[in-house]
């Protein structure tokens, strides 16, 4: 399944707020999940499916990419769900978004694809690049790019940057301090349901 490029409002009406996809928050429609005993199995599947879709649309990844992340998380030591979230949160496009350099993850991905982002002084044009502690992230020295970033930073600094990241507004440089903990995730999600959804595939 390819990356979603359709109307974003339609997605958040169905799944709820997804700040990585869009900063819009329209009225949500009431859930139509049937809670009767006869449909319990179907309802539980749908709940897991929707949690999985939240991750996919929020981080802007394909079905195959998400499945690969689940497989990596399963092989690592620790909580599979928490490790899965850490893998997604440490993607370069997401780190740029969480630093406040862009209003959405698709916007961050565009900066990376257009070779505007430096990691430790080197151009990185792979949005899925996995950031690690002590990585420095900044914009390439281009007036247009810097103007866009400065405008975004000024607006989004009112939102608290998570503790695992730091942004130096004078140097216009972000720093990954450490691997984030569960409390720093910028999305309301039940990752255990996602792991359960993939239990037969990963």
From Swiss-Prot:
Top-level lineage group: Eukaryota
InterPro entries registered for this protein in UniProt: Ribosomal_uS4 (IPR022801), Ribosomal_uS4_bac-type (IPR005709), Ribosomal_uS4_CS (IPR018079), Ribosomal_uS4_N (IPR001912), S4_RNA-bd (IPR002942), S4_RNA-bd_sf (IPR036986)
Molecular functions (GO terms) = rRNA binding; structural constituent of ribosome
Family matches, as Pfam families: Ribosomal_S4 (PF00163), S4 (PF01479)
Could you tell me where this protein is found in the cell?
A: Plastid, Chloroplast
Per UniProt, the keywords (alphabetical) are: Chloroplast, Plastid, Ribonucleoprotein, Ribosomal protein, RNA-binding, rRNA-binding
UniProt cross-references to SMART domains, sorted A to Z: Ribosomal_S4 (SM01390), S4 (SM00363)
Q: Where is the S4 RNA-binding domain?
A: 90-153
Q: Which GO terms describe its biological process?
A: ribosomal small subunit biogenesis; translation
GO CC annotation terms, alphabetical: chloroplast; small ribosomal subunit
Annotated PROSITE patterns: RIBOSOMAL_S4 (PS00632), S4 (PS50889)
Quaternary state and partners of this protein? Part of the 30S ribosomal subunit. Contacts protein S5. The interaction surface between S4 and S5 is involved in control of translational fidelity.
Family according to the record: Belongs to the universal ribosomal protein uS4 family.
Q: What is the annotated role of this protein in its UniProt record? A: One of the primary rRNA binding proteins, it binds directly to 16S rRNA where it nucleates assembly of the body of the 30S subunit.
Q: What is this protein called?
A: Small ribosomal subunit protein uS4c
User: Where does this protein come from, organism-wise?
Assistant: Hypopterygium didictyon
Q: Identify the gene encoding this protein.
A: rps4
